[in-house]
């Protein structure tokens, strides 16, 4: 039976998961647009591409539910074709083909040319930086590397994304320059591990060099670093953060735990003492650095003593931003060979205890901001307020600054000077300073 052509059909790209998936979808849509395809962001598309996440159980469930939803729409005649790509498809393709056969085709994370061909398009290698961005115009993600070479015992990312592949500095500068010409003011650098950047193609860590090139781009005002790895952290990056005004005094560095015993089992390449030494170095070199981290509760073998050690450490370190998650026992990871011996209710209780501590820390730190002035980027208008961020806050995950829109107009994407007049756990209230 002949398959209908995808030539003039509207294509709806649905993105699930993290910022790396957002970036990948933007690249896909940019390629489709360059091929003359019509990309839509509503449910009217005749062709649906689902970019899935396969990181932990909740993400996998959301991806499977979304696939099943659109397969049913296909059965009901509401869409013509359903294609699936991304991490879930990379990790479980044979199982998905067997269990959800009504999907037209599955693609892995490194099969963009094949996906484009199925959509009636050709992959154009020369289109460096040609993305159809889905973030607000004034900020954009810049993925500097794909994959990961780290051996973390709990993580399935290398199974889905492969080993680390850095992108050449010149390609990244070209892409960032195009973004700036289109109105982007903030670059959010992402990778599975920013600090590994360059080791594969330059034989040394080159994140600092990349940053010094990116700050030269006219129009870029903020450069933000997401997802650094603590072991082997290149401290020359701290010099760049301190010296270059465009590089935000902010870093997202998932630390996962502080028990040396568990860090060893996690294969993180660090210890309690080395972790604290790195944090001390960060705060010494960049005194007003905002540090965001992520922790795991309930890793195999985590005792009450290990947990109490982490609680005390969180109280001691007073991280500016912190997220905490329960351990997910992922097949084909090194930790899957260990007994998942912490009950789910204990994992969840530990997460809640950590987040209760962090909520108080966040409130106390925000209270200290009252009366101080900050440069704020306006992200959007919401009801009777404009919503913005300081350089110490990343979109969607950190503090927001609310500024009354009554008798005030603030263009989205503009910077304004703001004095903080009220503060809560995760929100700041400010007024514009002339």
Could you say what each language-model-derived stretch is?
Residues 1-197, 236, 247, 251, ...:
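Proteins enriched for Cys/Gly/acidic motifs involved in redox and nucleic-acid/cofactor modification
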Residues 16, 151, 155-162, 222-231, ...:
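Conserved strand-turn element in the central/C-terminal portion of the radical SAM core barrel
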Residues 18, 198-219, 265-266, 327-360:
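Radical SAM enzyme [4Fe-4S]-AdoMet core and its adjacent flexible, acidic
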Residues 54-59, 184-209, 213, 217, ...:
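Conserved glycine-rich "GG(E/T)P / GGGxP" loop and the immediately following alpha-helix
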Residues 172, 189, 225, 253, ...:
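Conserved, mostly hydrophobic/aromatic
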Residues 181, 208-209, 216-223, 234-295:
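Radical SAM/AdoMet-radical enzyme domain recognition
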Residues 202-215, 235-249, 302-319, 344-349, ...:
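Short, electropositive alpha-helical surface patch
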Residues 337-434:
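Terminal RNA-binding accessory module
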């Amino acid at each position: 039976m002949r398959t209908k052509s995808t030539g003039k059909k509207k294509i709806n790209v649905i993105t699930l998961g993290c910022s790396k998936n957002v970036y990948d979808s933007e690249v896909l849509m940019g390629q489709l647009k360059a091929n003359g395809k019509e990309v839509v962001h509503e449910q009217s598309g005749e062709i649906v591409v689902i970019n899935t996440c396969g990181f932990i159980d909740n993400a996998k469930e959301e991806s499977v539910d979304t696939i099943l939803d659109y397969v049913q729409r296909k059965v009901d005649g509401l869409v013509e074709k359903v294609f699936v790509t991304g991490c879930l498809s990379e990790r479980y393709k044979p199982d998905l083909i067997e269990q959800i056969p009504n999907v037209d085709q599955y693609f892995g994370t490194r099969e963009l040319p094949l996906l484009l061909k199925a959509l009636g398009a050709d992959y154009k290698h020369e289109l460096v930086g040609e993305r159809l961005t889905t973030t607000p115009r004034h900020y954009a993600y810049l993925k500097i590397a794909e994959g990961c070479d780290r051996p973390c015992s709990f993580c399935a990312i290398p199974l889905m994304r492969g080993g680390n592949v850095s992108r050449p500095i010149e390609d990244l500068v070209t892409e960032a320059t195009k973004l700036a010409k289109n109105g982007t003011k903030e670059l959010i650098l992402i990778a599975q591990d920013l600090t590994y950047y360059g080791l594969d193609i330059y034989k040394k860590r080159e994140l600092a060099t990349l940053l010094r090139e990116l700050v030269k781009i006219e129009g870029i005002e903020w450069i933000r670093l997401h997802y650094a790895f603590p072991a082997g952290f290149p401290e020359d990056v701290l010099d760049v953060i301190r010296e270059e005004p465009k590089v935000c005094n902010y870093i997202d560095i998932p630390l996962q735990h502080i028990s040396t015993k568990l860090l060893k089992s996690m294969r993180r390449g660090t210890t309690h003492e080395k972790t604290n030494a790195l944090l001390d170095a960060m705060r010494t070199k960049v005194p007003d650095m905002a540090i965001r981290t992520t922790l795991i509760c309930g890793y195999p073998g985590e005792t009450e003593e290990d947990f109490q050690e982490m609680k005390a450490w969180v109280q001691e370190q007073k991280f500016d931003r912190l997220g905490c998650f329960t351990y997910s026992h992922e097949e084909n990871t090194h930790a899957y060979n260990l007994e998942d011996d912490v009950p789910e209710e204990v994992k969840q209780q530990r997460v809640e205890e950590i987040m209760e501590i962090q909520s108080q820390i966040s409130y106390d730190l925000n209270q200290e901001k009252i009366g101080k002035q900050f440069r704020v980027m306006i992200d959007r208008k919401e009801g009777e307020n404009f919503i913005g961020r300081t350089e110490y806050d990343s979109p969607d995950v950190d503090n927001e600054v609310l500024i009354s829109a009554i008798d005030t107009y603030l263009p989205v994407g503009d910077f304004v000077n703001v004095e903080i007049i009220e503060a809560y756990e995760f929100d700041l209230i400010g007024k514009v300073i002339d």
